[in-house]
C-alpha cells in the first residue's frame, strides 16, 4: 500500500520524466533532421544527439526504478530484478555523465580564449582528444560494471533477510569489502566530474574576462555581445550547479542506498540524483542558438494552432 510520501515521490518522479523527455526528444529530433537535411553532422550536434539518446535511456530506467521504489521497494531484494535495474541505471548514467563531460570540454575549447600554448595545442587536437575520452569512458564502464557486480552481490546478501546468519557472522568482512568497492566506484566517477568542473570553471573565467573587456570598451555596439556573454555565464553556472548536485547525490547514494534501502529519505536522494538528466536538456536548448530558434518557432506554431477556432460542424 503506497503511503502519501510514496505518492508525492511518484508524482515528482513522473513530472521529472515528462519534462526531461520533452527536452531530450526535441534535441534528438532537431539534430537528426538537420543532419539528414545538410548531409553533414557537426561534432557538437553529434555529442548533443548521443547525450539526448543516452539520457532518454536513463530516464526510462529511472521511471521504472521510481515505480519500483515507490510501490514495491521489497522487490529490490529480488536478486535478478534488483541487479538488472541497478546495472542498467549505472550504465546509462555512466554514458550520460561522460557525454556531458565531453560536451563541456568541447564548448570550453570552442568558446574560451586563453593565450597559453598548452591551451592552443589542445584546441588544435580537440576532436581527437574527445574521441580518446570516449574510448577511456568505455574502458572505465567495463571496470565499473565488474566492480558494481561484486558490490551488488555483497549488498543484496546483506539486505536479504534469508541471509541473517551470514550477515551476523560475516558483517565486518562484508562491510570492509563494500567500503573498498564503494571507494573504487567513487574514484572512477570523480574522473568525469573533475574534467567537467575544470572545463566549465575555465570557460566561466574566460567569459568573465571577455565580458569585462567589452565593458571597458566604449563601443555601444558591444552591448548585445556583453548581454550574450552574461547569458552564457548564467547557463554555464546553472549546468555546473546541476552536475555538482548530481555528483554529490551519486556519492551519497553509493554509500547509503544498500544500508538504508527501505528508508524514506532515499527517495529524496533519488529525486536530487535525477535532477541533472531531467533539467540539463533545457539548459542546452537555451544555450544553443539553433535549438533555441527552433523551439521558439515550435512554440509560436503551437500557440497559433491553439488559437485557431475550429469550424462548426454542419
UniProtKB/Swiss-Prot annotation:
It is a multi-pass membrane protein. Residues 1-7, 72-101, 149-187, 260-265 are extracellular. Coiled coil: none annotated. The chain crosses the membrane at residues 8-28, 51-71, 102-122, 128-148, 188-208, 239-259, 266-286. It comes from the Eukaryota. InterPro entries: GPCR_Rhodpsn_7TM, TAS2R. One of its GO terms (biological process) is sensory perception of taste. Glycans are attached at residue 163. The keyword Transmembrane applies. Disulfide bonds: none annotated. Keywords: G-protein coupled receptor, Glycoprotein, Membrane, Receptor, Sensory transduction, Taste, Transducer, Transmembrane, Transmembrane helix. Residues 29-50, 123-127, 209-238, 287-314 are cytoplasmic. It is found in: Membrane. One of its GO terms (molecular function) is G protein-coupled receptor activity. GO terms for cellular component: membrane; plasma membrane. Belongs to the G-protein coupled receptor T2R family. Most taste cells may be activated by a limited number of bitter compounds; individual taste cells can discriminate among bitter stimuli. Receptor that may play a role in the perception of bitterness and is gustducin-linked. May play a role in sensing the chemical composition of the gastrointestinal content. The activity of this receptor may stimulate alpha gustducin, mediate PLC-beta-2 activation and lead to the gating of TRPM5. This is Taste receptor type 2 member 42. It comes from Homo sapiens (Human). The gene is TAS2R42.
Amino acid at each position: 500500500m503506497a503511503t502519501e510520501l510514496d505518492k508525492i515521490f511518484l508524482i515528482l518522479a513522473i513530472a521529472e520524466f515528462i519534462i526531461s523527455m520533452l527536452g531530450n526528444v526535441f534535441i534528438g529530433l532537431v539534430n537528426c533532421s538537420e543532419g539528414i537535411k545538410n548531409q553533414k553532422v557537426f561534432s557538437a550536434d553529434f555529442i548533443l544527439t548521443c547525450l539526448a539518446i543516452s539520457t532518454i535511456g536513463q530516464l526510462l530506467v529511472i521511471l521504472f526504478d521510481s515505480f519500483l521504489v515507490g510501490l514495491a521497494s521489497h522487490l529490490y531484494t529480488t536478486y535478478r530484478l534488483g541487479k538488472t535495474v541497478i546495472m542498467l541505471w549505472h550504465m546509462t548514467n555512466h554514458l550520460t555523465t561522460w557525454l556531458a563531460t565531453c560536451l563541456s570540454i568541447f564548448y570550453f575549447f570552442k568558446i574560451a580564449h586563453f593565450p597559453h600554448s598548452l591551451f592552443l595545442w589542445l584546441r588544435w587536437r580537440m576532436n581527437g582528444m574527445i574521441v580518446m575520452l570516449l574510448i577511456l569512458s568505455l574502458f572505465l564502464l567495463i571496470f565499473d560494471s565488474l566492480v558494481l557486480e561484486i558490490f551488488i552481490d555483497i549488498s543484496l546478501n546483506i539486505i536479504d533477510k534469508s541471509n541473517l546468519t551470514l550477515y551476523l557472522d560475516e558483517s565486518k568482512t562484508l562491510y570492509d569489502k563494500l567500503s573498498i568497492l564503494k571507494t573504487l566506484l567513487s574514484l572512477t566517477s570523480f574522473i568525469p566530474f573533475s574534467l567537467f568542473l575544470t572545463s566549465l570553471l575555465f570557460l566561466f573565467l574566460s567569459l568573465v574576462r571577455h565580458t569585462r573587456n567589452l565593458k571597458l570598451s566604449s563601443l555601444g555596439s558591444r552591448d548585445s555581445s556583453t548581454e550574450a556573454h552574461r547569458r552564457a555565464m548564467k547557463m554555464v553556472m546553472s549546468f555546473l550547479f546541476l552536475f555538482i548536485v548530481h555528483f554529490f547525490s551519486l556519492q551519497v547514494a553509493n554509500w547509503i542506498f544498500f544500508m538504508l534501502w527501505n528508508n524514506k529519505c532515499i527517495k529524496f536522494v533519488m529525486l536530487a540524483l535525477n535532477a541533472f538528466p531531467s533539467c540539463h536538456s533545457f539548459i542546452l536548448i537555451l544555450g544553443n542558438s539553433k535549438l533555441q530558434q527552433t523551439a521558439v518557432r515550435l512554440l509560436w506554431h503551437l500557440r497559433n494552432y491553439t488559437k485557431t477556432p475550429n469550424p462548426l460542424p454542419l
